[in-house]
Amino acid sequence: MINIRKSHPLMKIVNNALIDLPAPSNISSWWNFGSLLGICLILQILTGLFLAMHYTPDTTTAFSSVTHICRDVNYGWIIRYMHANGASMFFICLFMHVGRGLYYGSYTFLETWNIGVILLFTVMATAFMEYVLPWGQMSFWGATVITNLLSAIPYIGTNLVEWIWGGFSVDKATLTRFFAFHFILPFIIMALTMVHLLFLHETGSNNPMGIPSDMDKIPFHPYYTIKDILGALLLILVLMLLVLFTPDLLGDPDNYTPANPLNTPPHIKPEWYFLFAYAILRSIPNKLGGVLALVLSILILIFMPLLHTSKQRSMMFRPFSQCLFWILVADLLTLTWIGGQPVEHPFIIIGQLASIMYFLIILVLMPVTSAIQNNLLKW
């Protein structure tokens, strides 16, 4: 008699994706982040659902409803901080996941990679809308500044901004629609994740060496389920350390002041995970140029398969490309630091140099270095 997990219409799907899935025998801990992102998404949806039960998307009561959640709702404080810091963990895992894809050449799975980039944009949109909901000072001014960037689009820019705001400034209509979008987008992310996995399972996973692994596959369960559980425990440990010891470490103190349209904070900045893109935006003196650079800083990932000139897929045996990759990581950390600094003398020029370096490494240095290494193989 055939095993029920292999014959039942629903269990068969789960079995083929999580139990009997043939996986390469040599994938490292860098392959853990996919499952960690799934855990983060489920955690965010669950905590967000409970927060939405008590939150009111209205300019007069939004700030006090968040205070009410933290003070009066049973375990409301832990749900709120798990949701806020869970977003940070989500982005840490996302950046690691994308970095792994770049390092090991996973972008050669075109459909999986392109859906992944769409997922990244969707998660960033969701996280941006979340920033507006507590209706603190940084919520209001962050939303005003970032949405106002769309006015740089020729002809339709101003109309587009007013259409998104639902008026002539960020107000009740903006808050209500951002709450609605913030609620629905995670479910769209979940659907896109299913498509992402569907395309991945068409080709099978990549591996650190970047070579076909069809001749040496092992079942996903128990080998990688155990490995993923270990990763999940470490993720939850770090998250709970953040939540229980330093819940406001990654937030902005200005958001503990209710939104006031008449008082602008001295330094308007987004959440830490957007600072690298914000630094690229600020490094260009022209508004439209800045917006284009901001979009391109993420959209550039779509072009990675076209920029791949190496005969080898992975960077494992390409030392020069490895050096460039880690310089790129250092550059992104520099941009993140600059994004949080005021716009004054040393930071402006550092930001501009780091922005030039970012695009130079990806568009010029990496493809050229890969081509040079191809010639070195002939020696």
From Swiss-Prot:
GO molecular function, one term: ubiquinol-cytochrome-c reductase activity
Pfam hit, one: Cytochrom_B_C
Any one GO BP annotation for this protein: mitochondrial electron transport, ubiquinol to cytochrome c
Listed transmembrane segments: 33-53, 77-98, 113-133, 178-198, 226-246, 288-308, 320-340, 347-367
UniProt cofactor note: Binds 2 heme b groups non-covalently.
Binding site for heme b b562: 83, 182
GO cellular component, one term: mitochondrial inner membrane
Annotated positions binding a ubiquinone: 201
Cofactor(s) needed by this chain: heme b
Membrane topology per record: Multi-pass membrane protein
Subcellular location: Mitochondrion inner membrane
Binding site for heme b b566: 97, 196
UniProt KW keywords: Electron transport, Heme, Iron, Membrane, Metal-binding, Mitochondrion, Mitochondrion inner membrane, Respiratory chain, Transmembrane, Transmembrane helix, Transport, Ubiquinone
Domain of life: Eukaryota
Extra remark beyond the main annotation: Heme 1 (or BL or b562) is low-potential and absorbs at about 562 nm, and heme 2 (or BH or b566) is high-potential and absorbs at about 566 nm.
Family: Belongs to the cytochrome b family.
PANTHER family associated with the record: CYTOCHROME B
Summary of subunit composition and partner proteins: The cytochrome bc1 complex contains 11 subunits: 3 respiratory subunits (MT-CYB, CYC1 and UQCRFS1), 2 core proteins (UQCRC1 and UQCRC2) and 6 low-molecular weight proteins (UQCRH/QCR6, UQCRB/QCR7, UQCRQ/QCR8, UQCR10/QCR9, UQCR11/QCR10 and a cleavage product of UQCRFS1). This cytochrome bc1 complex then forms a dimer.
Job description of the protein: Component of the ubiquinol-cytochrome c reductase complex (complex III or cytochrome b-c1 complex) that is part of the mitochondrial respiratory chain. The b-c1 complex mediates electron transfer from ubiquinol to cytochrome c. Contributes to the generation of a proton gradient across the mitochondrial membrane that is then used for ATP synthesis.
Protein name (Swiss-Prot/TrEMBL): Cytochrome b
Organism: Giraffa camelopardalis
